[in-house]
Amino acid sequence: SYLPYQKGVYFPSTADKEKISVGAERQRRYRVIRKLRSEPTEEHLWETVLLYCGVQFKTYSGLPFTYEIRKGRSGEYTKELWIDRRGKSKSLAWSSVLLALGNIKKVGEVVERPKALSDIRGVTYIYGMFYRFGLIDVPKEVKEKKNDRGNKKQKKGREDMLEENIKFFRRL
């Protein structure tokens, strides 16, 4: 090959994530999310969950987590998500995810808290995933937690700097 690139855009949709470019991966995610939102079925959800392996999500309280899906002896994916939070893995059964999907009344509806989806093990992780996939919406306070970047000291430092800038420009 004449090109020094290891990743490309022009691979079939079945190509591994390692072979496609970041832009192509983003396009795949966009398409699968659009399909899931228009028709929230088990197949579309499974396709979305597979594409989002390794992507960081946040729980209801704003704690980050990722998940992976392992392959079984036959080479097929197992229907079990392994949630990785601070180096510890917890398993989440696919049936729990489907139960929560069945409890969503309307796509885009505001769900106040994770337990509103269902009283199942791992629902805080499912809540974060469904919000990211656009299946549910969350209250404003929760959005602020999920979008909060940095710790409180950094935030306080940014606020102090902003106040100093405002005072400086008022003097001019």
Predicted regions and their residues:
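BZIP DNA-binding basic region
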Residues: 1-31
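Intrinsically disordered, charged low-complexity linkers and terminal tails
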Residues: 23-172
